[in-house]
Each structure stands twice: as C-alpha cells, then as structure tokens.
Design a protein with these regions (language model features):
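Active-site catalytic loop in hydrolytic enzyme cores
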Residues: 1-72, 76-77, 86-93, 151-153
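A short acidic/small-residue loop/turn micro-motif
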Residues: 7-10, 141-145
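CN hydrolase (nitrilase-like) catalytic-core segments centered on the catalytic cysteine
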Residues: 48-144
Length: 153
C-alpha cells in the first residue's frame, strides 16, 4: 500500500535539540485508498504530540489526515515506560489524546503499543477506538495480547 515516515520527531528541549529530530527523515502526510476507505498512518508521538518529548508545536496530524480523507488511522507506538508515577500520567495523557482525537476527527483509530518489558504497564492502551471516541476493542494494559476487530466501511 505505501510507506509512512514519522512526522513529529522526538527530541530534547535543549538548543539545539538532540534525538530523533536530528536523525530521522520526515515525509508529507499521505492517505492511502483501500477499496473506498481512506487510510492514514501515524507513529507514536505523531498522534499525541507529548510536550515533554518534542520541541515542535502540535500540528494536529489526526485532523490533517481527516481533512485529506482518512477514515481509519493505524497508529504504531513504542512508548517509554517505567513503574513510576509519571508513567501513569503518561498513560492517561496518551489514552485521553487517542479518544479525543478520534472523536474530533470522526475517525477510527487502531493503535498498538510495544508491550516490553512485560512487567510494566504499557505506555498507552492498544485496541480500536470508534469515531465517537469510545473503545470498541481494547487489550489489557500490561502484557502481550492479540486483537481483531471488524470495521464496517
């Protein structure tokens, strides 16, 4: 179908910023057509624009994809995590952003986070969120699971 490159790269808040921001190439957002359904892709911080992870402003990429005709966004996550309080705050921030952005863009969001290390809670929930912002399929917050959900076009 195509290729998506990370759009909102992470980097330190120092001047100059360090991290992905200095190593990753970015490409314009694209929508792929799959028999009458517009599909988009986002990688990790592309979706939630965590202010602690990037010096760039929030470009609202889910809204941009909706404007380009996307109806479903596939979201791949490899978030940082730990057992501390701020990991819990990050989880809540990620979940709220997933739900709010699905609802605002009237989009389906299919999201999957890396589950390792499995002795800690994931950095964000995995599953499927409807255009109403509701979870219609969701995995446990910790450990490895597989999910399947049919989205009617």
């Amino acid at each position: 179908m195509g290729f998506h490159s990370k759009t909102l790269t992470c980097g330190s808040l120092t001047d100059p910023p360090r991290g992905e921001i200095e190593r990753y190439a970015v490409a314009p957002l694209r929508v792929y057509n799959w028999p009458g359904v517009g599909l988009g892709g986002l990688i990790c911080n592309d979706l939630w624009a965590n202010p602690g992870c990037t010096p760039q402003p929030d470009p609202h990429l889910t809204q941009q994809l909706a404007g380009l005709g996307a109806r479903i966004i596939f979201h791949a996550v490899n978030g940082g995590r730990g057992g501390d309080e701020w990991s819990q705050v990050g989880f809540q921030y990620h979940e709220a952003n997933l739900r709010m952005r699905a609802r605002a863009g009237k989009l389906w969001i299919v999201t999957a986070d890396n589950c390792a290390p499995d002795h800690w809670r994931c950095s964000s929930p995995s599953g499927v969120i409807s255009p109403d912002g509701d979870w219609v399929c969701r995995t446990a917050d910790q450990g490895e699971e597989i999910f399947v959900y049919s989205i009617a076009s």
